[in-house]
Amino acid sequence: LAKSGTNDRGFSILSLETAMSGAANQLFRFEEVSPGNGYAIICKDGNLSLDVMDYSHQKLADIILTAHQSNSQVNKWWILEECSERMESSMTYTSDYKQPKTITDSRGNTVHYEYDDKNRLLTKLTDAKGNATSYAYDANTDKMTEVARMVDGKEVKVSYTYENEKVTSIGHNGFTYDYAYDPFGNLESVSVGGRELERTTLRSRNGLADRITYATGEAVRNEYNSEEQLAAQYLITADGREEKLFENTYDSCGKIARHKDLCSGVISTYQYDLIGRMVGTDRSDGMKLRKVYDEKNRVKGYTYQKDRVGHEVEFLYGDVEKQQKPGLGYGIKINGAQKIAYEYDALGRVIRTHNHFSDTNTSTQEYTYVSGKEAGVTTNLVASVREGNRAESYTYDACGNVETMVERSADGSERKIRYYYDALNQLVREDNQKQNKTICYTYDVGGNMVRRDEYRYIENPVITEAPWKSDTFEYQTGGWRDQLHFYNGQAITYDAMGNPLQYLGMQMEWEKGHQLKHITGAGLDMYCMYNDSGKRIRKTVNGVTTDFYLDGSAILMQTSSDGSRIDFFYDDKGNVFAMKYQNEMYFYRKNLFGDILGILDSHGTELVKYEYNSWGKLLNLTDYSSNGLGRRNPFRFKGYYYDEELGMYYLNSRYYDPETGRMLSPDVLEVLVVNVDSTAKNLYLYCDSNPIQRKDDDGKILHCVLVGAASAAFGMITTIATNIVTDEKWNDGLVEVGASSFVSGALSVSGFGPLGSAVGQAIGQGVIAGITEGYSLWKKSKTGGITAWDVTNSVINVGISISGGTHYQKKDSIYAKGKIRRMRNRIRDYNKAKAGGKRGVIARRKAELDRETKKLGEMVYKHSKPDWTSSLLNVVNNVVSGSQPVDKPKGGGKRVFYMRW
């Protein structure tokens, strides 16, 4: 900005010039003339300052220079607009502009893509650290047949075979997972290493699932009413005895009105509003739950009560009149008193969290974020978290993994942990000042940890001395080679389903395929009971029974036969943040990863401190309370529920053992066909051996990266493609979008191959517009208000429309070809499977729905392919930069507003 010439009335005016060092006419200074109100912008010589021609506020009025006075006139006060940083990414393309060639994030990290000679199929992906993944395809069908990556000189490879476009085998770690189908194409049986685990029998005429028979000899049989709704379910034991598990009664709208759990004896009745949202639950044991919604169909709050004691929780959302962002949560109230308040920056990132322990006691956590490569560019990666005189700071590698964490204590002392990862982002080493040791981890080509060595604390990258402690892991040499056979010489045996029977001094019994029923040994006698959705509702340990009262998978309250009761409270993301015990409120202190590090009372006094290793094993527990609060509190590492008696975490469908760093039992085989482009096919792994920033709340093989909410645009596509159409949880973190995930190689559209897959391209074009329209619908779906179909339809329709009016009209032909109808049927089958509560059936129906989604995506892609790359680039740039342009698509289609957060 320079003083340059005069206007027609002789006033000096300004123009843009190329910057030149030392040019006198380019030097200005800012002088505050009214605190908080404005500045005078004064030339270097001090005689002239910026003014507006004729004091005009009209568009195109000249900015001029007039004589400067010590007391500047009001018309010469300049209000400096607060300008936020930006997030940005960039893409380059192949020479024919058909495919992305590189994607670079805000930190300058780049992922490279290579394709076949026709630029159709992705053959190689090289992440930002130079690790390459190669892909091979069937020459006739383009089906992916192999995924491979080199890790420390060893090839990690997954292979696929197909029949009639269905996966029939997956090769991994020297054995295969096998899938068999009936003549109608329905999944009939699954096997591991040549041993059949379960078989599904359908009703006549390609009907619903009649029963599932497990390798242990048990079976689950379904019973339906005349409307083909699941009316009852039975467990058939190995000796042929039949036990009825539950009964369902439906209302005239097809929703469950009454559910009788015959195992616990509890009867639940449900109430819905006029648009089908669940607003109330009454249980025969006295538990009552009520929910209310706001005008945007978000859960505004809920109340629950048992034995005349209850609580009210209210979620506070952004209010435009208060200059808040309406799509974000601004706080939580408990019984009318605000307990959490959030502050955001211009990009929608949390910068402060205020915890109100009482009216007079508050603590504040402040967040800063990692800067981008250039000035003014930022990211969603958290750089530091500060609370009072205590702080944590973080750095990241090029793939977005946490590289260092420095913890500064209240006394000013600092302790540092440095993490190292291999080409699969598995944790291979940590230099841990907190534990005063260096720990190294070694894995086989199946991802199984084979050795854990501990040394004195060493910062040198090369370790030459011998470890002072080693843990060894030995695995099956045949069949299911991912099964841990010996841990430090202790033998582990398994049943036919892959569940452990003898485990580190304990004996275990299982039922319904994968549910842990009874544990004995080492002074422990523990029984567990589950509901129809497979969630644990009761445990009895050495004669003391604890009942869990759930809202979905969240434990609202637990009561024990010893007379104790604990209530738990959750934020708007579903993370537990407080508890009430013996009529006193307590609050959790957490780190960035969600680990509960301490418990504070209503005065802000820390009564309990926890310390874990990287895998969640409790190292130290300090308890200053007078009521044993440290042991009574069940939520610990990552906010998981910890069974103190068992020494394991319960993750809502499976148990996780922090001693071995592995899941106790395998996930269902059907999940393996969801991510065909991934090398992660080990059903026993916890978070793919990256426990630092990954989390597994529900015990499923699919997990999310937490740090900085670093789900980028492609992470959003992945989540939509795999979750939204199946009525699964749609991650709230999608509103906090960064670029780290897609640069770390998280470019896969789950179930449909790498970036170039049809559904990824189709949904990719409309992802932002689809989210804009589908977000409120999802909120309804999340709380039972609408079906997944409503959300799916919205995203698909808008996803098509983003390419323009011509493409939008193709929706009708898609309807005519029956693709939408078939998807609706698949969603119906999936929801019925969910009602049945069997994970195997659920996963099978989800896989079927994924395949139907792919077919629909391919059809959409045919009509939108010419413009998908440019549209997707707009999506990426606008999402990660936080801008909000209004785009008029080609062909006169709808105007699309990109979301801003």
Report each predicted region and the residues it spans.
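Short, tandemly repeated low-complexity microdomains enriched for cysteine and small residues
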Residues: 4-23, 58-70, 112-114, 156-159, ...
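A motif-centric feature for acidic-aromatic and gly/ser/thr-rich catalytic loops and repeats
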Residues: 91, 319, 367-373, 472-477, ...
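Membrane-interacting helical modules
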Residues: 704-901
